[in-house]
């Protein structure tokens, strides 16, 4: 039985990718990103009350201090609750005197509370973190281009980097469309996705290179790429599934603090499988035709 030709249907896979990327780009320009205080600067107050309080009660107090737009999170897990003793408040950057006034007002109106954690991130620090995050991702791409060029050749490297850029863009698309918060852990997730995705792509490229040594003149390069992809398909599927099992478990049971981190990896790993399986080989063929020796 003849196997499905991935190369011959490359336009379909690239069209799907293009639609997703267009949606993402529109969302990025229209809605932007929900940047956490790691990037924008701000304050985090982790408070525990003696009695359960609601979001509305806390927001009413904060509104009197011009902090009504603050993000208020109840509890310490993903479980949605109407009231809780544990409250996490994310605001714009406030001074120590403002914080003391807010805490005193919360105590007077909602009961005694204990401050478990206070974090302040200045706007300058947040801006520096954005530059560092972008620099880290770009540096990883540059190093991979150098490594793959040495290990294989430039055409393989270019195809791999385009696949990685797509993976990063797809992950950013989901976070923009769903308006999920992007913090420093998101950068770590992106770098993890880049490393995982390039690993899957390298496996396919390594098989293509091996098959080139036994390539028959009457066999088209498209058939060779298809054969290489299918020869590595079982490995790719098993590796992706076993990795996703762990990531899904973290996503479901890991708690609020790493929820977005695990979601970024979940999206990125799925995209990595898609690009390495359905796009990378066809992109190598494209660069092979354009950059003939």
UniProtKB/Swiss-Prot annotation:
Q: Please give one Gene Ontology molecular function term for this protein.
A: protein-transporting ATPase activity
**UniProt cross-references to InterPro entries, sorted A to Z:** SecD/SecF_arch_bac, SecD/SecF_bac, SecD/SecF_CS, SecD_SecF_C, SecD_SecF_C_bact, SecF_bac
UniProt-listed Pfam families: Sec_GG, SecD_SecF_C
Domain of life of the native organism:
Bacteria
Swiss-Prot/TrEMBL GO biological process terms: intracellular protein transmembrane transport; protein targeting; protein transport by the Sec complex
Q: What is the first-listed, main subcellular location in coarse terms?
A: membrane
Protein task? Part of the Sec protein translocase complex. Interacts with the SecYEG preprotein conducting channel. SecDF uses the proton motive force (PMF) to complete protein translocation after the ATP-dependent function of SecA.
Q: What is this protein called?
A: Protein translocase subunit SecF
